[in-house]
Amino acid sequence: MLRARTAKKDFTALPLTECLAKTYRNAHGVTAAGRTVLDHALITGAVAALLLERLPKCTLPFYPEGVDRIVSAHDVGKVCPTFQHKIHQAAGSLGTFPELADADPSLEQDWRGHASISFAALKAVQGNVFIPQIVGRHHGVPPKESYTASCNAYGGDAWQKRREELLALIMGERGWPDVSSKTQALLLMGLTTVADWIGSGELFDEPQKDWAPLVRKAVDHAGFLPLSLQTGLSFEALFGFSPRGVQQAFIEQVSGPGVYILEAPMGMGKTEAALYAAYRMLEQGKAGDRKST
């Protein structure tokens, strides 16, 4: 039996300047409109870029150039009628936008919310199979993949066009990064989730504030600080006793990153030997980046 095709509806999309990503509680204790989706996109991209700066240089080959742009795109799915209805209602501004009058936020349970729209939007505009999954899973669950970017549920062509406008602002003249494997995609999902968490912090609540000077402070507060290492310490200075022969022999064998096995009876100091060997690698710049003191 043939099923009749659902007729395409005519939608009018909000301008990007009115598409909210966040609300916040203002100084009077009232829930108010917070950052726009574009602002939040730029914030999370900047957070991701700073996180990458602070990772050990040896890990950077795992991250494709321009990965911050993927992170910025994670919430493009919030540019849709159901999410905007919900958030403007919370902010007390729903009546200002007749374009949202017929939207029903309760329907989002059918497609698992805005992350699934992000998945569909990215699938529609670029060819890498992993990028839609990265943005679609930034809340830790797989997206609903059976909806297309321009379907009625997601706001039709008008809202997909608005999402494409947002993506164009994020990308500029640059192309999409090349994500080459599922393993790499999983790594980038983690980066996206952490950057979103930091970029959603209260430091960025007030939309009137310039967000750029707050990025470093937010990343610092989240604990992603450069390693500070006091160099030149002896084994005895760290542990209060001179190394045993087996410890000294092990330490001398550790000349670079790798897997080393020290077999010795309990009480011979295997833990201290391993810790001091790791300290030596950090001191020599062979185990990631550090700041010497």
Regions found by a protein language model. Give the residues of each.
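Accessory nucleic-acid engagement/destabilization modules that flank
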Residues: 2-230
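Conserved small/polar residues in nucleotide/adenosyl-binding loops
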Residues: 293
